[in-house]
Amino acid sequence: MTAPESPRRAIVVSAAWEATWPLVAEALHATWSATGSVAVVRADAQSWATVGEVVRTAGFDPSQVVHLASLGVPMAPGDLEYLPSLREVALSPRSGYGSGLTDDLAAAFAVEGIRHHAHVAEGFWGQSVAEYALALTLCGLRRIPQLHQAMQSDPRVWDYAPDGGDRAYSHRGAQFGDDDRFASGTVAGKRVRIVGAGNIASRYASFCVALGADVAAYDPYAAEPAFHRAGARREWHLDRLVADAEIFAPLVPLMPATRGLVTAAHVDALPHGCLVIWATRAGVTDTEAVRRRVLADEVSLAADVFDVEPVPAGDPLLGRANVVHTPHNAGRTRHANAEWARQLAAQFTDL
């Protein structure tokens, strides 16, 4: 990406920020360049130079920049001296979360008539996480990762004959390799019970509805339209939600109000054999209770998130027949990066 001499838009991005969102700057550049000149400036990961310090030495004239996205590069009121035409700006702090707007900067923007844009929700990764949660569900029901691994070293995986008691599964037959001690087989016909009706949970619910599941959801913070979007029956009481769950998916974000929302009593009320899905944050449930029931072979677990990350080698959850595990991989896809850029760019006016 070469910088035009007098761009109308500029993207200033820290290499440290791109370690969190590696494809956003590329996607934002593609979106903006369709309607005008765009400069992209990358700052070193170790640099704490401000936006003004970066653009004044970037090899282009910043005085015509009207739209600015600063991704992981801090901005100070004094930087506006180098950006006299600036009218709209988006800031993201180095962590990749939040707006990056300080009180001093907000006051300076107000004086200059500069509009600040920020994400109003985290819908940019909703599709990626929801699809991953569905994939975890299918893998948990059908033991796909376990079969993949076993096929590499154990020819017995091809033997579907009744086992004569040497395996734990209660049934075995031609091409029937599910572990029916736990929820298994199809999503169709399953009682899927979801905590949440937001960007991730509503999508996951709609997927399960489309596959023929009986879906109910509990979310004390969601408005009624969210349940219609999900296609799920609204359950008003969490203790009722868990009582008949065959698949239980707590898919709310982790906040002070949701930490431990699913208590040990709720976990203990899950029916024997229930498949638990962890795809947003494990801490919304009582993780010790989930661990206890999984290790006792009372429920199964398909998880991309955990109470401790990275999960230490030797953790008793790893490698179990009733656990599918992946290393916190759900949210960051090319699609999520592109949506991060698209949803932010949509807030800017046309040039």
Question: Model regions: which residues?
Answer:
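N-terminal glycine-/charge-rich "phosphate-binding" loop or analogous flexible N-terminal tail
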Residues: 1-73, 216
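Rossmann-like adenosine-cofactor binding region
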Residues: 76, 220-316
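Phosphate/diphosphate ligand-binding glycine-rich loop within oxidoreductases
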Residues: 63-166
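Glycine-rich NAD(P)-binding loop of Rossmann-like domains
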Residues: 147-203
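Glycine-rich, N-terminal phosphate-binding loop of Rossmann-like dinucleotide-binding domains
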Residues: 69-72, 93, 250-252, 280, ...
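C-terminal helix-to-coil terminal segments
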Residues: 2-8, 12-31, 124-128, 140, ...
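Rossmann-fold dehydrogenase core element
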Residues: 107-123, 271-275, 290-307, 318-330
